């Protein structure tokens, strides 16, 4: 997983010039970033090693039909152009949309039923990456069929439960931590990938973009004993790991949005300005035997 994250981080692109329709692939694994990675392989030891492991994993996935490693298959296809990966992604997507639901039995048994959770959010992300990668290898009818299936299984439950009226069952007061950003933002990325075929998907992605700043700005609720999402210094009350996951999901959506809307300005999020200081403060040992301040003093 660390290997795919290494390259995924490099593959985040900010383009220039506005486009009404998405030119696939154009979310995270953009042609520009793919080319940059190709140039670095052979020159950067870590990048070369990461790519080798990713391709090996993708080759193993050719033997199955699981969505779980669709990001590996997608990257392998975009890096190599080998149709065997595209064919496998197409097969996986067509098989995936045959499901009745992606919801878990545990969550669906709740009252009211939770149609979506973190597991479903991750499936939405993987589906978005796969659809974006293989889009140009699909016929018009296949694009439409897969888009409708992914919208039903992923976008509608995620944005329906967590964001959109009149079916929304969660709020920042009830679920203001990183579940909210994961479910909303991964649903948003999937919606972005489907927007050429489905106007409702484009509207859903726009709603995510419009409302996402409210998660950062949530001021808490004294009556329900809910702390605000971030304090003035940039810290998150639910711990470093919760902050990392929640912010990661939000930023991935913003990167995909920016790539899909080159030239557009992103919303101003003041809380982002303090996040690097927060992470550095929490991760930098300053007590006991691991006190880096003492070691720094000796070195200086």
What are these regions (language model features)?
Residues 26-41, 46-289, 295-296:
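Aromatic-lined, polymer-binding surfaces characteristic
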